[in-house]
Design a protein with these regions (language model features):
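P/S/T/G-enriched low-complexity
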Residues: 1-207
């Protein structure tokens, strides 16, 4: 017989999801971004149950299962293939390697500074394992409105979403991602924003 050529470990993988703004099905995918115990493939601890570690990763977290954000986080954090079955390896992006050690996104709505370490800054992608990066596109006005979560404001820039508005509040924990399942369609456009953050991609809201 013949031996198959190993897959290249340096390949980058992307998922681009487009919708009119709000999903209306009954998904079942589990809880992945709000777990209390998780070590990423490079040895970095995402969750160990301590308040200190939770504080570093608040922008990614919620307490709701079965969301797009859960799927995006799992696709990013869980290796797509076993590293030993690949030839070569993936390196973090150049943008990540050149990024500052910390970034201050200004103050949240309560006046608290929103500061993220480079590794936990969704602007950059530190992953060095086979993973999926998720980009989301919301193609209607519904993608930028969430009447069920009136305390959350979108960023100034929409194409792609920027890092002001309520983003600093998500960083500090002054705001939490709403219940995308129980809250129904009035809040689900926010799942597109959350999924892009969890998947280390960007959210584009276009009309």
């Amino acid at each position: 017989g013949t031996t198959d050529t190993p897959y290249l470990g340096c390949r980058r993988n992307y998922h681009i999801m487009m919708t009119d703004g709000r999903w209306n099905s009954s998904p079942s995918g589990g809880q992945h971004d709000g777990v209390n115990s998780l070590t990423l493939p490079d040895g970095t601890v995402y969750a160990d149950g301590t308040a200190t570690q939770i504080a570093k990763t608040r922008v990614f977290r919620d307490t709701i299962s079965d969301t797009l954000a859960d799927w995006a986080f799992r696709s990013w954090s869980d290796p797509l293939q076993v590293a030993t079955s690949l030839t070569g390896s993936l390196q973090p992006t150049v943008d990540y390697l050149k990024a500052p050690a910390t970034e201050n996104f200004g103050n949240d709505s309560a006046g608290n500074p929103a500061v993220l370490d480079r590794y936990w800054n969704p602007r950059y992608n530190p992953a060095s394992w086979p993973h999926m990066v998720t980009y989301t596109i919301g193609a209607s006005n519904d993608a930028t409105t969430w009447p069920g979560a009136s305390t959350i404001s979108g960023p100034t820039a929409k194409v792609p979403f920027g890092y002001d508005g309520s983003f600093p509040d998500f960083v500090t924990g002054n705001r939490n991602w709403p219940d995308m399942v129980g809250g129904g369609e009035p809040v689900r456009a926010l799942d597109l924003w959350h999924a892009a953050i969890n998947g280390r991609g960007r959210f584009y809201a276009v009309n």
